């Protein structure tokens, strides 16, 4: 059984070795001189305008977290959709309960005003 996973493990080892080898090799042979130009933030070849340390409104982080939450919901729903015929009524009830719990969470977030941009 271990033999079936051998190509995947070999691929992971080669990828890790290549990545780590590239980082170590570039740090060994790369130049170590830092100048003001090299330490400036890169903005698409244009001159930097203002500071790179801007504060973002907390709403952006909240929307990103909600996006990740509902994206994970889709990840959990995909295997259920693939195995729907094998799971039968039990799988339908289980996923229905899962979706209802997430919908209640969505309503809670909506009622708290997290989705409003004022």
From Swiss-Prot:
Main location class: membrane
Subcellular location: Cell membrane
Highest taxon listed in the record's lineage: Bacteria
GO cellular component, one term: plasma membrane
Keywords: Cell membrane, Membrane, NAD, Quinone, Translocase, Transmembrane, Transmembrane helix, Transport
Catalysis performed (reactions): a quinone + NADH + 5 H(+)(in) = a quinol + NAD(+) + 4 H(+)(out)
Transmembrane residue ranges: 5-25, 62-82, 87-107
Keyword Membrane: yes
Catalytic activity, EC: 7.1.1.-
Membrane topology qualifier: Multi-pass membrane protein
Single GO MF annotation: NADH dehydrogenase (ubiquinone) activity
Chain's role: NDH-1 shuttles electrons from NADH, via FMN and iron-sulfur (Fe-S) centers, to quinones in the respiratory chain. The immediate electron acceptor for the enzyme in this species is believed to be a menaquinone. Couples the redox reaction to proton translocation (for every two electrons transferred, four hydrogen ions are translocated across the cytoplasmic membrane), and thus conserves the redox energy in a proton gradient.
Subunit structure: NDH-1 is composed of 14 different subunits. Subunits NuoA, H, J, K, L, M, N constitute the membrane sector of the complex.
Family: Belongs to the complex I subunit 3 family.
Entries under HAMAP family matching the protein: NDH1_NuoA (MF_01394)
Protein name, entry field: NADH-quinone oxidoreductase subunit A
Highest classification ranks of the organism: Bacteria, Pseudomonadati, Thermodesulfobacteriota, Desulfuromonadia, Geobacterales
Gene for this chain: nuoA
């Amino acid at each position: 059984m271990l033999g079936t996973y051998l190509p995947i493990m070999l691929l992971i080892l080669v990828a890790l070795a290549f990545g780590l080898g590239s980082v170590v090799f570039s740090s060994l042979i790369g130049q170590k001189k830092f100048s003001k130009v090299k330490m400036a933030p890169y903005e698409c070849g244009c001159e930097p305008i203002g500071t790179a340390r801007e504060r973002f409104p907390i709403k952006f982080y909240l929307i990103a977290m909600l996006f990740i939450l509902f994206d994970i919901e889709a990840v959990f729903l995909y295997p259920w959709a693939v195995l729907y015929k094998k799971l039968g009524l039990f799988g339908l009830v289980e996923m229905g309960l899962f979706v209802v719990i997430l919908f209640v969470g969505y309503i809670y977030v909506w009622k708290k005003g997290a989705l409003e941009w004022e």
